[in-house]
């Protein structure tokens, strides 16, 4: 009887130990998967912005930081920081293209000296197994080209949001030109992640002190970004 009791205790302890190991492994695996990031940095003096960095995590969290003037004639403002959730479709494309680009291991720049400078770019990948990056001006690699386009389009969208927020506070008549340009760029598929600037678009769309044509444009952009204003 006592032997059976000891055996049962040992079996129970073994089972508990195995469950503990499984739990630790599951937590480690989940942490490893969620820690993967792809980032893009651009430094291009005299452009607007002259520097920005965008990092996307495999869990959908994204961070954007930029410096530079709002317009060519304005004074340099404080650095701009924004955190948002990237759409699943864009996140999937980013990590898929990173894999196709072999996670930026090795050289990706064309190495050609007769290509005009479009800014110093850095693509980087980080997870539990890799920590790689590649610097380039122009790359002939199709996956790198796709990533460059995606990140630049996201930056353009977020910089629109930055200017819209400023104009909404200090120069409301300037909103119309910005919103009109945004609509045109959406049609030409030159913007990504419109939902990231939905808060300022909602503020404009519901602000009675903004002219109607600008409010209507903001409403259309919200609908295109998948966050239409609810009708009352």
Label the model's feature ranges:
Residues 43, 48-75:
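N-terminal secretory signal peptides
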Residues 63-82, 180-183, 199-200:
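Acidic/histidine-rich, surface-exposed loop or edge segments in extracytoplasmic proteins
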Residues 2-14:
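Bacterial N-terminal signal peptides that target proteins for export
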């Amino acid at each position: 009887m006592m032997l059976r009791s000891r055996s049962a205790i040992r079996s129970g302890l073994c089972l508990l130990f195995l469950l503990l190991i499984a739990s630790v492994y599951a937590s480690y695996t989940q942490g490893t998967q969620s820690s993967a990031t792809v980032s893009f940095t651009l430094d291009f003096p005299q452009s607007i912005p002259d520097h920005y960095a965008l990092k996307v995590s495999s869990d959908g969290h994204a961070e954007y930081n930029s410096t530079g003037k709002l317009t060519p004639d304005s004074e340099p403002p404080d650095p701009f920081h924004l955190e948002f959730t990237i759409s699943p479709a864009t996140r999937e494309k980013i990590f898929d293209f990173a894999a196709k680009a072999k996670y930026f291991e090795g050289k990706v720049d064309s190495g050609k000296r007769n290509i005009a400078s479009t800014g110093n770019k850095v693509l980087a990948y980080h997870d539990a197994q890799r920590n790689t990056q590649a610097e380039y001006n122009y790359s002939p690699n199709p996956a790198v080209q796709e990533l460059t386009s995606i990140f630049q389009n996201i930056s353009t969208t977020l910089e629109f949001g930055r200017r819209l927020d400023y104009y909404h506070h200090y120069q409301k008549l300037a909103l119309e030109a910005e919103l009109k340009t945004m609509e045109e760029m959406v049609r030409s598929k030159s913007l990504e992640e419109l939902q990231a600037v939905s808060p300022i678009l909602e503020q404009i769309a519901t602000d009675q002190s903004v002219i109607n044509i600008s409010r209507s444009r903001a409403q259309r952009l919200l609908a295109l970004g998948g966050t239409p204003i609810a009708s009352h």
